């Protein structure tokens, strides 16, 4: 199954459908239909906003129609799913649920979770509301104290201000099956800020945090505003030995179908030295792009590790 716990307007699932369409283009009509059904039935998409859920459902139907994967006028044929069947599956698998305080609607956890969680603090969420202060305190308290059925606290990495993206990172790892992959688009501040230390410890010490792509403040991406943007890659429940940090990246470093170009700047953080020079805070250093400055920074890091 593929999941997005804050599906928004459905941008990620649209991209997945387009990749799916490209990859099945050479198959028989029956194989295309069966593969498309399998993909739709494996979707696990939720959002706490009814508006977002309605938008995502409509987007998925429109994309399926444009890709020629559904029969708009009938009950389907050898190569296409009927519209009524597609809409029924989509309605069942795109739901309005609070992923932070609610229960996941599916028994089987996802093996792949890709999302861009909201970059908000609780106090920003209710800014301007006449009862904002009371609402903020109430939600913050519920999130801090929320317990699972076995008595465990759901969010163990809360520290300082309650930032929603931190909660979504921790929750995403809980939702996935052991060995499942999580990729999240988050602010770069999570890599270094002190208040994210408990979350980084969780990423490194209880999971395999193996990659991060970092784009600086002037990234020219369509999201992120003036903040640095990072994409973290985690395998749930495994062991972190080496984190490969790519960056600072530019738009030209992104390669369609490959991820990043082969000469994108990167360096590797080995667990032992990394723990030593960060005093087990697992902070990821902000690197210069210049080859000379980069070499100096890496040399300094090596000395700290020694």
Task: Name each model feature, range by range.
Residues 7-14, 21, 48, 53-54, ...:
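Signature of N6-adenine DNA methyltransferases within the class I
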Residues 19-42, 63-88:
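Flexible phosphate/Mg2+-sensing switch loops adjacent to catalytic phosphate-binding sites
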């Amino acid at each position: 199954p593929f999941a997005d716990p804050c599906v928004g307007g459905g941008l990620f699932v649209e991209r997945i459908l387009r990749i799916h369409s490209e990859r099945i283009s050479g198959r028989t009509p029956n194989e295309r239909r069966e593969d498309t059904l399998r993909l739709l039935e494996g979707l696990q998409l939720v959002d706490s906003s009814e508006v977002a859920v309605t938008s995502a459902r409509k987007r998925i139907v429109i994309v399926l129609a444009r890709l020629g994967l559904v029969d708009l006028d009938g009950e389907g044929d050898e190569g296409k799913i009927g519209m009524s069947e597609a809409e029924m599956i989509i309605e069942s698998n795109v739901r309005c649920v609070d992923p932070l305080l609610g229960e996941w609607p599916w028994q089987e956890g996802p093996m792949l979770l890709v999302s861009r969680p909201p970059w908000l603090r609780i106090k920003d969420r209710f800014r301007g509301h006449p009862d904002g202060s009371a609402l903020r305190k109430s939600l913050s308290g519920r999130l801090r104290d929320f317990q699972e059925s076995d008595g465990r606290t759901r969010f163990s990495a809360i520290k300082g201000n309650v930032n929603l993206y931190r909660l979504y990172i921790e929750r995403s790892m809980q939702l996935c099956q052991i060995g499942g992959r999580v990729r999240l688009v988050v602010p770069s501040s999570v890599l270094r800020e002190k208040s994210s230390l408990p979350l980084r410890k969780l990423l490194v010490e209880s999971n395999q945090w193996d990659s991060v792509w970092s784009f600086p403040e002037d990234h020219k991406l369509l999201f992120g505003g003036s903040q640095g943007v990072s994409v973290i890659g985690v395998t749930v429940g495994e062991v972190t030995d080496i984190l490969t940090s790519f960056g600072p990246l530019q738009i030209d470093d992104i390669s369609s179908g490959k991820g990043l170009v082969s000469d994108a700047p990167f360096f590797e953080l080995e667990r032992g030295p990394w723990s030593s020079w960060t005093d087990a805070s697992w902070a990821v250093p902000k690197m210069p792009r210049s080859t000379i400055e980069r070499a100096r920074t890496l040399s300094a890091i090596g000395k700290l590790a020694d």
